[in-house]
Structures are given as structure tokens and as C-alpha cells.
């Protein structure tokens, strides 16, 4: 508090001349209490700060009547201190502050709504601690309120303060009072809004999911677009589309195209192997080195290695038991498929299950492995090291994974990529063939 305020607060005469330090001319009041006053043996007095300056410089009392060396050569002037402490004064909170940061004389006026108590200087500090007319900032200043009020009026202000925090009636988040309508109309995730496509009412926070997975009027691709059906239609028409002739025709055309491409590749590869074997066979009977090379080639497993991409994986809804079937995997005279159950086959958990199934050919033994691509570098790998027996309509072999494949780096452009290798059991060595000729 600025000490100049006391020139305006004393109820009767201005005591400044009697209770101002004769050396520095400052009123003997230090913030919230009467300043310490000391006097020399001749009765000459001054405030403590001035005596400290005297000890450092002249070492003479203010009237220059005696020499002083230290505070120990002085005594407290209780007469001056007590006389000042007993003076009556108006409470500082009787004033209006046109500039709330200072109590300069030119900026203070009496306030009809101010404190009317008269107190002594000595009791001023304790009075101010409980004075309900003291000025205080609104506790909502951290939220932007710049108001300053007397304590007695603060509760009334808080009832209407636009920066008071309130619970949103929809989401229960704390929102400042003056912004709560804007929050509800434009931001609140629990506010129900109307879908512009179908007119149904959905919480704002669920609208993206509604549009991506539920809204019947959104145009979507066929769930088998990766397998050749490129038609677009409203989600509400999906069931009818899956039963349509055009959809089935698209799939059949794609299957025929893939089979033709696959057969061309396999025939080309087999022709190369046949040419190598024919060349070696002409030399094998008389050349041991050539015979060993033939054994090496034939002892290799017939195998197929590829990547199966499932697009739009996260945007699809899967019921328990639904599965994707990979394009045909042809190894030798055998045809296989991978079956992927996104939500498991029969397990009550939401594990992803993946099986290798023999769909054409005689009973055979295979080695196979898979790797589910992770774009963060943590591929999920699994391998059946030993030969597994498969037959059409019989045993399947596979895995179940307790992971969320829609997150964690397994999707890129919303596509799940599965690398796989299927190998048929080893064939007899050429030495066995030659031995029976």
C-alpha cells in the first residue's frame, strides 16, 4: 500500500509534520505497521533506515548535538511510535480507486459503498485482514474475467460472471458460461445433430463413424471390389447387389482373368525347368556331376510365394464367421486358398483367424508360412516348420492372432497385406528314378 494514502485518511488534522521522520520526511509507517523509531541520548529521533545511513556516514544525530556509533547507543522512541499508533484513521477501503494499481492522492475519492469504520493506525493491519470492503479480483481471471470488486459484492458477481465454469448439459465438460451455447451448437461431441445424407439423428462425435459404416445413403464400393467387382451403389442396396447377376458376373470374369494369368506364369516356369532337366538328363547317365545337379533341382520343394492384399479393411463391418477367401494358390497339381476370419470363426473373442485350405488335388503334405506386414517394422510372422497333411474337405491348418489389425501400423492406405509361402513335400530324387530304369 502506498504510504501517501495516509495524508488523505486521517480523520482530523494531518499528522504528517509530527510523525514524519525529521531526516527523510517520510511518514513512520512501514507497509502494514508503524516503523521502528530510535532516538539519541539528547532525544533527537529518526526512523531506523535513516540511523543506518548515519552510522555509515556522519555518525552524528540529526540535530548534530551528539555522536553515535551504532544502534546499541540508541533507544526506541516509544513515545513517538505509540503516539502515532494511537491516531484514528479511516479504513483505506472507504475510497474509490480510479486507478486500481495505486493509491496516489490524485486518484482516490470517497465511496458511498466503501467501509465506514474508523480504526487506529496500530490496528489497521488486523482490520484490513477481515474487511469485507477490500477490493479483490474475480477468481475467474484465469478464464479471462478482468473485473475487480469489493469482497462483499463478489458472490453476486459470480452468479452472473460470463467466465464462470459450468458443466455442459450434454458432455459434462467444464465450459465458461458465456461460451456454453456456442460449445453446444458447434463443438460438443455429445450434441445430437442430423445426418445430411439420411436425416437420422446422431451424436456429433459419432457422425464420421455413421457416415463411414452405417448411413444407408452413402455411395460405397462393393465389399469384393478387390476381387473384380467395381460397381458403386448406396449402402442400403448392398444386400440386393450381392445377389445380382451383374455382381456375380464381375467376380467370375475376374477369377477367370486371374487364373489365366496364373496359368501362364506357371507354364512358363515349368517349361524352363523341363528344358533344364532334359539337358541334364542327356548327360546324367555318364556324368556324375550332372546327376547330382538333377538331384539338387528335383529335391527342391515345389512352392508358391505371393502377397494377398485386402483393401478397405477398416471400413468394413464383419459378423462372426464371415471370411475372406484369397485368389487361388496353385502349386503343382494342387489348388489352395487362404481363408481369413476378421473376427474369428467360432471363438467368442475378436481374434483374427487365418487358415490354409486345400480346394483341389490329392491329399498332400505341405510346409507353409505367413507374414502380416507391419509398416512400423514389426511384421507378424508365423511358420509351420513340419509337414502338415491337407486334403479337400478335411483338415485345415492356421493361426489365431489376438491383435487389433485396424491400428498399430498394419494398414497402409487401408490395406492389409499378407505375405505367404506354400511348399509341397519333397519329390523322389533322380537317383531313385534312374535305378528303376
Swiss-Prot record:
Pfam families: MATH_2, zf-TRAF. Probable adapter protein and signal transducer that links members of the tumor necrosis factor receptor family to different signaling pathways by association with the receptor cytoplasmic domain and kinases. It comes from the Eukaryota. CDD domains: MATH. This is TNF receptor-associated factor family protein DDB_G0293202. One of its GO terms (cellular component) is cytoplasm. It comes from Dictyostelium discoideum (Social amoeba). Induction: Up-regulated by Pseudomonas aeruginosa, PAO1 strain and down-regulated by PA14 strain infection. One of its GO terms (molecular function) is zinc ion binding.
